[in-house]
Amino acid sequence: MSAATLIATKPTGTGPFAKFAARPLVVALITLALITAARVNGRVDSDVAWQLWIAGRIHAGANLYTDIVETNPPLWFWMAVPVERLAALLDVRIESLLILAVGFITALSLAATDRLALHIEPIRRGLLLAYAAIVLAAMPWMHVGQREQIVLITTLPYAALVASRREERSVSALTAASIGVGAALGFALKQYFLLVPAILELWLLAGQRRGWRAIRPETLALVAVGISYAAAIAFIEPDFITRIVPLIRLAYGVFGAPGIQYLFGPFAIVGLLLLGALSLRFRVLAGRSTPIASAMAVAAVAFALVYFIQFKGWPYHTIPLIGCASIALASLLAEGKETPPWLRVFAHALFILPLVLSAEEELNPALPSPDLLNAVSGLRAGESVAFLTTETAIPWSVTLQGHYRYASRYNGFWMMRAIIRNEHSPNPDPRLTALGRQIASDTARDFACIPPQRIIVTRPRPGESTFDTLPFFLRDRSFASLLSHYRVRSRTSLETYELASPFPAASSGCRKGV
């Protein structure tokens, strides 16, 4: 029997299974515990590895946005600092502790949602929450700890709360405020995510009309967290505003999907299929009989807009779209009085498909590639390594995992695309020209302060038209002089240089905490 059939059919009976299934939150938490236990010794993706590394450098005294160049706002990195500290105190893998922390906030999300879904009879609610646990914890398997997973986890109870408001159900101020704080922290991770509470609020306004009230515990919590976060950036990390925002405006625009076709990968197509299935039940969702399903469908539409506005096409950007749409479909079956047979069959495939894609992504990762593993083979934990690549995922699929010391202030040279395009422009922007010189100079200084045992360079193969990074850096005399101390170790899709004649590390002008 499929998950769709289980949710859509009201089980009966008084046996042990029925009694157990009648405890919805227990069923969901056991499901979550099993997933977390299976995941706890796994790896994290390159972005999360970079996040965790930064947390350690912050504790060591590095200044974010000066000693480390990062384009994202600081909240995500601040979230990782206590995880890094606790992992160091307990002497455990930081990745494992992060996975446990994500499991904990997922449990809070499920518990809050359970309190807001009491209109669904217990067995159906248990099945719905168990499926939600799978979506929140297992579907983003390879991307555990990503901002998209966190915002999905915090959106679920917030959407359920907005649904309760639309139905004028009583919710305690403490519960509403707590959900609002959690949701605010999720929405604050990216400015794009703010579109989601805005669209949910418009949906609530359309449903309540004159009965709508803007001032509620959860909206006050959203505003309070937002103001506090903005103030924290201004006073604690002003360099984000003065240094990083201008860098983003100057060079980040060309760092994205080469064309619109790249936005329609397998994960995006699954998300759109889920939205299509929901649209077939538009009349039901537009009514009052399935409030949580309706709210989650609205959130899914909002996250679809977020995905396309970002215009990157990266699979993990679809996590909240797929997650909200999947839970909306499951809620439609759980809350609905009558479920058409075709929907049960269709839902069976759509419930499973995102998990199949996630499993395929985990079993066949693009990185670390065999060439990359060969490039770092023989390096010992604590030895320094450096990369010259525009793809930030390359260094951060091995650096944290191998416990290497990272030599650069840049997680990758993504800005080179804008710099090289500018060089070929008939009217080059002098700011981008100056940025290119600064990056080469900064890199030479970083490598002089932390002499890498190996420098790994992405270079085009014969016949490829992609940009060759190394000659650009060799224009800088200091960098060229430094590279003269290295010999070529291997040439594959990556060119690896091994330190051949050691040189004394620079003693001045070096960054802190790295």
Enumerate the language-model features and the residues they cover:
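Perimembrane helix-loop-helix junctions
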Residues: 5-8, 14, 196-223, 280-286, ...
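Extracytoplasmic catalytic/substrate-binding loops of multi-pass membrane glycan-assembly enzymes
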Residues: 40-54, 65-83, 364-368
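Extracytoplasmic
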Residues: 72, 192-193, 235-238, 348-513
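Transmembrane-helix signature of polytopic, membrane-embedded enzymes
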Residues: 110-136, 152-153, 169-170
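Short acidic/glycine- and proline-prone juxtamembrane loop motifs at membrane-interface regions
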Residues: 141-151, 314-315
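Specific aromatic-rich, kink-prone transmembrane helix
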Residues: 150-169, 175-183, 325-328
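Hydrophobic/aromatic-rich transmembrane helices and adjacent perimembrane loops
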Residues: 153-154, 195-196, 310-340
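Membrane-interface alpha helices of multi-pass inner-membrane proteins
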Residues: 172-191, 197-202, 300-308
